[in-house]
Amino acid sequence: HIIGDIFDRGPRADRIMDELMAHAHVDIEWGNHDISWMGAAAGCPALIANVLRIALSYNSYDVLEDGYGLNLRPLSVFATEVYGDDPCERFLPHTLDDVVFDHVDAALTARMHKAIAVIQCKLEGQLLRAHPEYGMDGRRIFERCDFRRGTVMLDGVEYPLADTHFPTVDPDDPLA
């Protein structure tokens, strides 16, 4: 019996999954990160953005590029064009171990992380707006932001946003 979150236990979850699939009988209790990856593999745009964001936040290029063959170049080009002058300090990756080979610049990773985080917020907001039956209106955070003033309203209290540079967000329609 394997207790889940295989995709939240360190680097190269793809290799762990390959090893498990080689066994005839495996009993897995799936965790939330595992389910996110399944949803991404099934094509859910919000979950694709979610797993990309989490992987980038931990500098896990190996699982994305080597393990699953994802081409991150379009995201890196987009992030550089949109956030090239933004240090994206709040989006710097957490590094669990030193990358000796295939080092990726932390500033580029931060830009990519911020770009996919904004995309994820938009996609999740669109999904939740389209499905009020999910009962998750409390998760529609982007629509509670006042991007002109740089604030967010949570539980009736207005807070300043820690980051206010969002050139791809239309203040009148943040989910567009």
Pin down the residues of each PLM region:
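Feature recognizes metal-dependent phosphohydrolase scaffolds
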Residues: 1-176
